Regions:
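Glycine-rich phosphate/pyrophosphate-handling loop used in enzymes and phosphotransfer proteins
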Residues: 1-211
Length: 211
Protein backbone atom coordinates (compact mmCIF):
# COMPACT_ATOMS: atom_id res chain seq x y z
CA UNK A 1 0.00 0.00 0.00
CA UNK A 2 1.41 3.40 -0.98
CA UNK A 3 1.81 6.32 1.42
CA UNK A 4 -1.13 8.12 -0.23
CA UNK A 5 -3.32 5.01 0.08
CA UNK A 6 -2.33 4.64 3.73
CA UNK A 7 -3.10 8.31 4.40
CA UNK A 8 -6.47 8.04 2.67
CA UNK A 9 -7.30 4.95 4.71
CA UNK A 10 -6.40 6.82 7.90
CA UNK A 11 -8.41 9.92 6.99
CA UNK A 12 -11.27 8.12 5.24
CA UNK A 13 -11.48 4.60 6.67
CA UNK A 14 -13.49 1.98 4.83
CA UNK A 15 -17.08 1.82 6.04
CA UNK A 16 -19.94 -0.49 5.15
CA UNK A 17 -22.17 1.07 2.49
CA UNK A 18 -25.19 -0.45 4.22
CA UNK A 19 -24.72 0.52 7.88
CA UNK A 20 -21.48 2.60 8.00
CA UNK A 21 -19.69 0.09 10.27
CA UNK A 22 -15.91 0.36 10.03
CA UNK A 23 -13.80 -2.24 8.26
CA UNK A 24 -15.41 -3.50 5.06
CA UNK A 25 -17.30 -1.97 2.15
CA UNK A 26 -20.12 -4.35 3.05
CA UNK A 27 -20.24 -6.02 6.47
CA UNK A 28 -21.42 -9.56 7.17
CA UNK A 29 -24.82 -8.36 8.39
CA UNK A 30 -25.50 -6.19 5.33
CA UNK A 31 -24.12 -8.89 3.05
CA UNK A 32 -27.38 -10.75 3.77
CA UNK A 33 -29.17 -7.95 1.87
CA UNK A 34 -26.57 -7.83 -0.92
CA UNK A 35 -25.76 -11.42 -1.73
CA UNK A 36 -26.11 -12.03 -5.48
CA UNK A 37 -28.54 -14.80 -6.38
CA UNK A 38 -30.54 -15.10 -9.58
CA UNK A 39 -34.06 -13.77 -10.14
CA UNK A 40 -35.99 -13.79 -13.39
CA UNK A 41 -39.01 -11.61 -14.07
CA UNK A 42 -40.85 -10.55 -17.20
CA UNK A 43 -42.04 -7.18 -18.50
CA UNK A 44 -43.89 -6.84 -21.76
CA UNK A 45 -41.79 -8.78 -24.32
CA UNK A 46 -38.62 -8.75 -22.22
CA UNK A 47 -37.17 -11.19 -19.69
CA UNK A 48 -35.37 -9.38 -16.87
CA UNK A 49 -32.58 -11.14 -14.95
CA UNK A 50 -31.48 -9.65 -11.61
CA UNK A 51 -29.08 -10.39 -8.76
CA UNK A 52 -30.45 -8.99 -5.50
CA UNK A 53 -33.82 -7.80 -4.15
CA UNK A 54 -34.06 -4.05 -3.66
CA UNK A 55 -33.63 -3.08 0.00
CA UNK A 56 -32.40 -0.17 2.09
CA UNK A 57 -28.89 -1.64 1.85
CA UNK A 58 -29.18 -1.95 -1.93
CA UNK A 59 -30.46 1.62 -2.13
CA UNK A 60 -27.43 2.94 -0.23
CA UNK A 61 -25.02 0.97 -2.42
CA UNK A 62 -26.62 2.27 -5.61
CA UNK A 63 -26.65 5.86 -4.35
CA UNK A 64 -23.01 5.60 -3.26
CA UNK A 65 -22.10 4.52 -6.78
CA UNK A 66 -24.50 6.66 -8.76
CA UNK A 67 -24.31 9.94 -6.87
CA UNK A 68 -20.89 9.75 -5.16
CA UNK A 69 -18.92 7.67 -7.66
CA UNK A 70 -17.44 5.45 -4.94
CA UNK A 71 -15.36 2.67 -6.46
CA UNK A 72 -16.25 0.11 -3.81
CA UNK A 73 -19.95 0.56 -4.55
CA UNK A 74 -19.26 0.40 -8.29
CA UNK A 75 -17.53 -2.94 -7.77
CA UNK A 76 -20.47 -4.40 -5.85
CA UNK A 77 -22.82 -3.49 -8.71
CA UNK A 78 -20.39 -4.73 -11.38
CA UNK A 79 -20.00 -8.04 -9.54
CA UNK A 80 -23.77 -8.45 -9.21
CA UNK A 81 -24.42 -7.84 -12.91
CA UNK A 82 -21.56 -10.11 -13.96
CA UNK A 83 -22.93 -12.83 -11.65
CA UNK A 84 -26.29 -12.67 -13.45
CA UNK A 85 -24.68 -12.80 -16.90
CA UNK A 86 -22.99 -16.03 -15.85
CA UNK A 87 -26.12 -17.52 -14.25
CA UNK A 88 -28.26 -16.66 -17.28
CA UNK A 89 -25.64 -18.20 -19.61
CA UNK A 90 -25.18 -15.00 -21.61
CA UNK A 91 -21.37 -15.08 -21.60
CA UNK A 92 -19.58 -16.65 -24.59
CA UNK A 93 -22.50 -15.92 -26.92
CA UNK A 94 -22.97 -13.39 -29.72
CA UNK A 95 -24.46 -10.78 -27.42
CA UNK A 96 -23.90 -7.04 -26.99
CA UNK A 97 -24.48 -5.08 -23.80
CA UNK A 98 -26.55 -1.92 -24.15
CA UNK A 99 -26.50 0.39 -21.10
CA UNK A 100 -29.41 2.60 -20.11
CA UNK A 101 -28.07 6.15 -20.56
CA UNK A 102 -28.11 8.91 -17.97
CA UNK A 103 -29.76 12.22 -18.76
CA UNK A 104 -27.48 15.09 -19.86
CA UNK A 105 -28.13 16.90 -16.56
CA UNK A 106 -27.23 13.79 -14.53
CA UNK A 107 -24.03 13.33 -16.54
CA UNK A 108 -23.02 16.91 -15.83
CA UNK A 109 -23.83 16.61 -12.13
CA UNK A 110 -22.05 13.27 -11.63
CA UNK A 111 -19.23 13.75 -14.10
CA UNK A 112 -20.07 10.49 -15.84
CA UNK A 113 -22.85 8.37 -17.29
CA UNK A 114 -23.35 5.98 -14.40
CA UNK A 115 -24.63 2.81 -16.08
CA UNK A 116 -22.44 3.32 -19.15
CA UNK A 117 -19.37 3.28 -16.88
CA UNK A 118 -20.65 0.23 -14.99
CA UNK A 119 -21.36 -1.58 -18.26
CA UNK A 120 -17.89 -0.82 -19.60
CA UNK A 121 -16.40 -2.66 -16.63
CA UNK A 122 -18.85 -5.54 -17.00
CA UNK A 123 -17.99 -5.78 -20.70
CA UNK A 124 -14.26 -5.94 -19.92
CA UNK A 125 -14.78 -8.68 -17.37
CA UNK A 126 -17.23 -10.77 -19.40
CA UNK A 127 -15.65 -10.32 -22.82
CA UNK A 128 -19.02 -9.22 -24.21
CA UNK A 129 -18.91 -6.12 -26.42
CA UNK A 130 -20.45 -2.85 -25.27
CA UNK A 131 -22.82 -1.01 -27.58
CA UNK A 132 -23.55 2.45 -26.13
CA UNK A 133 -26.41 2.95 -28.58
CA UNK A 134 -29.22 4.73 -26.74
CA UNK A 135 -29.82 8.34 -25.79
CA UNK A 136 -32.60 10.25 -24.09
CA UNK A 137 -34.51 12.40 -26.55
CA UNK A 138 -36.20 14.64 -24.00
CA UNK A 139 -36.19 15.59 -20.36
CA UNK A 140 -37.82 13.08 -18.00
CA UNK A 141 -38.91 13.47 -14.39
CA UNK A 142 -37.16 11.79 -11.47
CA UNK A 143 -38.95 8.43 -11.21
CA UNK A 144 -38.73 8.06 -7.43
CA UNK A 145 -42.17 8.50 -5.93
CA UNK A 146 -44.01 7.84 -9.21
CA UNK A 147 -46.40 4.91 -9.48
CA UNK A 148 -46.38 2.44 -12.39
CA UNK A 149 -48.77 4.47 -14.54
CA UNK A 150 -46.87 7.72 -13.99
CA UNK A 151 -43.54 6.03 -14.71
CA UNK A 152 -44.84 4.56 -17.95
CA UNK A 153 -46.12 7.98 -19.04
CA UNK A 154 -42.88 9.66 -17.96
CA UNK A 155 -40.71 7.31 -20.04
CA UNK A 156 -42.98 6.99 -23.08
CA UNK A 157 -40.94 7.72 -26.21
CA UNK A 158 -37.97 8.92 -24.14
CA UNK A 159 -35.27 6.85 -25.89
CA UNK A 160 -33.88 6.75 -29.41
CA UNK A 161 -30.81 5.33 -31.10
CA UNK A 162 -27.77 7.55 -31.24
CA UNK A 163 -26.90 8.82 -34.67
CA UNK A 164 -24.80 6.22 -36.46
CA UNK A 165 -25.43 3.49 -33.87
CA UNK A 166 -25.83 0.01 -35.30
CA UNK A 167 -26.01 -2.56 -32.47
CA UNK A 168 -25.89 -5.86 -34.36
CA UNK A 169 -26.84 -9.25 -32.93
CA UNK A 170 -28.76 -10.08 -29.77
CA UNK A 171 -28.83 -7.22 -27.25
CA UNK A 172 -28.93 -7.23 -23.45
CA UNK A 173 -30.06 -4.03 -21.74
CA UNK A 174 -28.15 -3.16 -18.56
CA UNK A 175 -29.51 -1.07 -15.66
CA UNK A 176 -29.05 -0.75 -11.91
CA UNK A 177 -32.58 -1.60 -10.75
CA UNK A 178 -35.93 -2.61 -12.23
CA UNK A 179 -38.91 -1.19 -10.35
CA UNK A 180 -41.92 -1.13 -12.69
CA UNK A 181 -40.06 -1.94 -15.90
CA UNK A 182 -41.04 1.33 -17.59
CA UNK A 183 -37.46 2.36 -18.42
CA UNK A 184 -36.47 -1.05 -19.78
CA UNK A 185 -39.72 -1.35 -21.74
CA UNK A 186 -39.13 1.96 -23.50
CA UNK A 187 -35.47 1.22 -24.17
CA UNK A 188 -36.42 -2.11 -25.73
CA UNK A 189 -39.16 -0.44 -27.75
CA UNK A 190 -36.69 2.10 -29.16
CA UNK A 191 -34.32 -0.68 -30.23
CA UNK A 192 -37.08 -2.80 -31.78
CA UNK A 193 -38.60 0.13 -33.64
CA UNK A 194 -35.20 0.70 -35.26
CA UNK A 195 -35.03 -2.95 -36.33
CA UNK A 196 -32.72 -4.30 -33.61
CA UNK A 197 -33.13 -7.26 -31.28
CA UNK A 198 -33.18 -6.76 -27.49
CA UNK A 199 -33.63 -10.26 -26.06
CA UNK A 200 -33.40 -9.53 -22.32
CA UNK A 201 -32.32 -7.11 -19.61
CA UNK A 202 -29.94 -7.57 -16.69
CA UNK A 203 -30.10 -5.45 -13.54
CA UNK A 204 -28.24 -5.51 -10.25
CA UNK A 205 -31.48 -5.15 -8.25
CA UNK A 206 -35.18 -5.76 -8.60
CA UNK A 207 -38.11 -4.44 -6.60
CA UNK A 208 -40.27 -7.24 -5.20
CA UNK A 209 -42.93 -7.29 -6.39
CA UNK A 210 -42.42 -5.06 -9.42
CA UNK A 211 -44.41 -1.92 -8.59
Amino acid sequence: MSFIDSLNQLLFPTRCFGCAALGLSICSNCRCDWHPHYYKTHISQLNVHSAVPYSSTASRIILASKENGLKGADNLIINAIFHVLIKADFVNHNIRLVPIPSSPSARRRRGRSFIVDITKSVAQRSGLPLSDSLELTRRVRDQSGLDATARAHNMQGAFALKRGAYPRGDLILIDDVVTTGATLHEAARALRSAGFNPIAAVTACLAQPLR
